[in-house]
Amino acid sequence: MESSAVVPGTTAPLLPYAYAPLPSSADDARENQSSGGVRWRVCAAVLAASALAVLIVVGLLAGGRVDRGPAGGDVASAAVPAVPMEIPRSRGKDFGVSEKASGAYSADGGFPWSNAMLQWQRTGFHFQPEKHYMNDPNGPVYYGGWYHLFYQYNPKGDSWGNIAWAHAVSKDMVNWRHLPLAMVPDQWYDSNGVLTGSITVLPDGQVILLYTGNTDTLAQVQCLATPADPSDPLLREWIKHPANPILYPPPGIGLKDFRDPLTAWFDHSDNTWRTVIGSKDDDGHAGIILSYKTKDFVNYELMPGNMHRGPDGTGMYECIDLYPVGGNSSEMLGGDDSPDVLFVLKESSDDERHDYYALGRFDAAANIWTPIDQELDLGIGLRYDWGKYYASKSFYDQKKNRRIVWAYIGETDSEQADITKGWANLMTIPRTVELDKKTRTNLIQWPVEELDTLRRNSTDLSGITVDAGSVIRLPLHQGAQIDIEASFQLNSSDVDALTEADVSYNCSTSGAAVRGALGPFGLLVLANGRTEQTAVYFYVSKGVDGALQTHFCHDESRSTQAKDVVNRMIGSIVPVLDGETFSVRVLVDHSIVQSFAMGGRITATSRAYPTEAIYAAAGVYLFNNATGATVTAERLVVYEMASADNHIFTNDDL
């Protein structure tokens, strides 16, 4: 039965929940993990309507402090006491996987999170299991009339370990039904984890699941599984092949550097199926991609050379993806040499924990992928997302003829907080991905159209003008579970009047408090005034050649007052073509802020763990921190978002 509660010391209701309340202490959490469930409805708490007011923004963004009382009451009551924190134990390369701990740490002990605070952090419309730890998306596929999502999951705890493949299905990639675990680490060749892999559906309907097994000695091998009943549209049971493991690391490859087989494709040059596996070359510490061919998915031949070797210093390539974009490209790879078709090669950087991609040409017969721009080679140039986004996996959706990409969003708080709240990590919103037809130098990513079905009440505030050095609070009913569409226009006379070049700005070092003639300007979300806020913004400057350059950034530096949280400033330069306004779509879902700027040419994902800007105190502001320009929000529409309907699968769902 759905329950509700009241924030201690206030009259503001908690969001309704359909799972057990959080434990009162970290010790209780370890003994009896809370189930963490899903939120069923959007928050009913209403922000007090406020008149638009112009305020000086410099102090707000630069970190000016004010005496503060509790936001909406004493939300910190019933807090989990701060206790001495141990330095986080690494869960990464020793296990042959990328680092799985955030590293968040405070020598003074963890922040005393209250249950109400932690309850608020759980998202409403992002995918996550009921409880415990999850990471990489695995084997996304459309099969039997269902979208299937498998993912790395620890069924026994809230940090990395005991990794199995969990499984959920959906009709729309928004509302999900949780199924029993698909595979668990029960064989010597995967006893330390059923790691990342992929699913391939053959033309005759056979379903092939390839995955990396982490053996009893922490060596990485490739394994095969098939459905116990291919006629089951839910693919509920899987059989591991008796020939497992089907692939071992070849000579010269480290035992822990051989993982994540890609969805296979059929190559007509020799009538074989191909897959690739990520690895690294210790000579130069460069990422490499190994290619294999097979006719039966049991016996494989290693193809000579590397499909690609990255620049020195790129390190281990994880979670490789390869697919065509542009022209008449579809789900199948065949080395199409049409000039309109480019091939996206993507890797997840084991060293940096970012997802890089590059555009290039692919000669399947020669087993060579070549970037179209060596300066933007794989691992040193373009990223899928400039924030907390990792281990992405795409699939071709035959139902709607589109490519969809998933990734997971890690935590940036402490492991102690994750244990207390009973869960860690979640999935991004699934995104469509395609070539930017205007630039042909980057991809366009956008939330799947099905997400719009969760939009409810809308507030249209288009036409607001924000003077230089000003901030305006938006009169919204709530600011914790929303979808914002905005486009901004700088006053043309202000742009024309600018004569000095500004080439020093950098998202990761400058932030939203650094003022220039034409920025920063944008939105403050999960904001309560002068104490907590996450900035989503543009910064426009003129180069030495007089051309305008635009940065799109997130500034997390003031997103929380908790000290045991990793906060960053993220973003990069984004192309803005003649006649285009500065546009952005921002999805705010409690502790997640995801942005898609310039139609999806650049994306950024932030984790935010506010201590005060929660529930009714979570506001949204327009800001303009430029010194010499007026900004107009030509379009500004804010949608309240309902929560997704996620629950354990029952026969009523058929």
Swiss-Prot record:
Q: Which UniProt keywords apply?
A: Glycoprotein, Glycosidase, Glycosyltransferase, Hydrolase, Transferase, Vacuole
Which EC numbers does the record give?
Answer: 2.4.1.99
Please provide the Gene Ontology terms (biological process) for this protein: carbohydrate metabolic process
Q: Where located?
A: Vacuole
UniProt KW Glycoprotein keyword = yes
Under what name is this protein listed? Sucrose:sucrose 1-fructosyltransferase
Q: Name one Pfam family in it.
A: Glyco_hydro_32C
Residue positions the entry lists as glycosylated: 32, 328, 457, 491, 506, 625
Name the enzyme group at the top EC level: transferase
- Species classification: Eukaryota, Viridiplantae, Streptophyta, Embryophyta, Tracheophyta
Q: Does the keyword Plastid apply?
A: no
Q: State the gene name recorded for this protein.
A: 1-SST
* Molecular-function annotations in GO: beta-fructofuranosidase activity; sucrose 1F-fructosyltransferase activity
- Main subcellular location: other
By its UniProt entry, which Gene3D superfamilies does this protein fall under? Answer: Exo-inulinase, domain 1, Glycosyl hydrolase domain, family 43
Q: Which family does it belong to?
A: Belongs to the glycosyl hydrolase 32 family.
InterPro entries in the cross-refs: Beta-fructofuranosidase_N (IPR021792), ConA-like_dom_sf (IPR013320), Fructan_Metab_Enzymes (IPR050551), Glyco_hydro_32 (IPR001362), Glyco_hydro_32_AS (IPR018053), Glyco_hydro_32_C (IPR013189), Glyco_hydro_32_N (IPR013148), Glyco_hydro_beta-prop_sf (IPR023296)
Q: Catalytic positions? A: 136
